Amino acid sequence: MDVAALVSGGVDSSVVVHRLCEEGYKPAIFYIRIGMEDKDGYIDCPAEEDIELTTLIARRYGCPFEVVDLHKEYWERVVSYTVETVRRGLTPNPDMMCNKLIKFGCFEERWGYQFDRIATGHYATTDLLNGKTYLSTAKDPVKDQTDFLAQINFAQISKLMFPIGHLLKSEVRAIANAAGLPSAKRKDSQGICFLGKIDYNDFIERYLGKKEGRIIELETGKVIGRHQGYWFHTIGQRKGLGLSGGPWFVVKKDIKRNIILVSRGYDPDAQYGKTIEMETFDFITEDAYEAGYWNREDATPVTFKIRHTPEFTRGLLYKGEKGYRLESEERIQGIAPGQYCVIYDEDHHLCYGSGMITKGR
């Protein structure tokens, strides 16, 4: 079986190569270059260091290695999506789009199609049910990344391998140390993948500029401050508001009038909601309603996430004529339109897919 391994130079993907070779595979290693390299001088994440470490891994295990450039495609599909989503006053998820459109989209179209399987360092697993592959959660609940993979499709999940999905992060580090891998002590990457060391607000300002507006207290209607543009702020945000007498939280945004509405206190009611609405829902493996596993006339018990966190929340999913509605068992903070609601089974093991949040209340 021919296997392609997507390797970033970090400890996780390095251990992927180690484990594949231990199991008798000789994977072809690919490093995907995607980052901030344009005419104005924005620089990628530390790509040269990544490539150097990946080269060492490839040489050590005698694997073919190729650097593939998907920078143009990344800008066109992921960065442009991020900027446009923010412009509309919504909350983007570029990491989900990168997995769907770049790592398992463009790469597959240009290189991956030559291979039987594609292995990555994601913390996730797969289950085979009724002859079909399902995305499943990882052994390590803190590192689990199924929420970042919840926009991929059946063709993509059927081809993926997650060699470290059944390991804890501590076990991955231990394997890397025992094997003497050059990335064993390397820190995990943080933040949005294409930004590297660039400040998020600096990036947004570069494309959307500044536009001063009012910050208004939701309960009183009183103007309590100024902001530089609604696009710099997200629902649930607490830091960076420049307000005294807090804590203050962003609870609403008036896009047309460029107004940020805030509320004071650790958990004011205005921050929380129990209902999530989605116009569409993308199942990964198969539509559970069409397959007959779920009945659209009944509420379906599920667990879900609306942000990257180890915790799952229980709720009931409804399918109606105009979309999907999720009723949470408990109030949840910061339901942000534009973000994705990721749906799991009741045991939060199988990941069914995700839908973009259109409204929360």
Curated annotation (Swiss-Prot):
Gene Ontology molecular function terms on file: ATP binding; tRNA binding; tRNA-uridine 2-sulfurtransferase activity
Keywords, in A-Z order: ATP-binding, Cytoplasm, Disulfide bond, Nucleotide-binding, RNA-binding, Transferase, tRNA processing, tRNA-binding
Active site feature: C98 (nucleophile), C193 (cysteine persulfide intermediate)
Primary location group: cytoplasm
EC number: 2.8.1.13
Interaction with tRNA: annotated span: 143-145
Transmembrane residue ranges: none
GO biological process: tRNA modification
Catalytic activity from the UniProt record: S-sulfanyl-L-cysteinyl-[protein] + uridine(34) in tRNA + AH2 + ATP = 2-thiouridine(34) in tRNA + L-cysteinyl-[protein] + A + AMP + diphosphate + H(+)
Gene Ontology cellular-component annotations: cytoplasm
One Pfam family per UniProt: tRNA_Me_trans
Cystine residue pairs: C98-C193
Site residues (Interaction with tRNA), renumbered to this chain: H122, Q339
Chain segments carrying region Interaction with target base in tRNA: 93-95
InterPro entries listed in its UniProt record: MnmA-like, MnmA-like_C, MnmA-like_central, MnmA-like_central_sf, Rossmann-like_a/b/a_fold, tRNA_2-thiouridylase_MnmA
Amino-acid positions noted as binding ATP in the UniProt annotation, renumbered to this chain: L6, V7, S8, G9, G10, V11, D12, S13, I32, G121
Localization (cell): Cytoplasm
Keyword Nucleus carried by entry: no
Family assignment from sequence similarity: Belongs to the MnmA/TRMU family.
Function summary: Catalyzes the 2-thiolation of uridine at the wobble position (U34) of tRNA, leading to the formation of s(2)U34.
Alphabetical list of NCBIfam families matching this protein: PRK00143.1, trmU
Name under which the protein is recorded: tRNA-specific 2-thiouridylase MnmA
Organism name: Porphyromonas gingivalis (strain ATCC BAA-308 / W83)
Gene name in the database record: mnmA
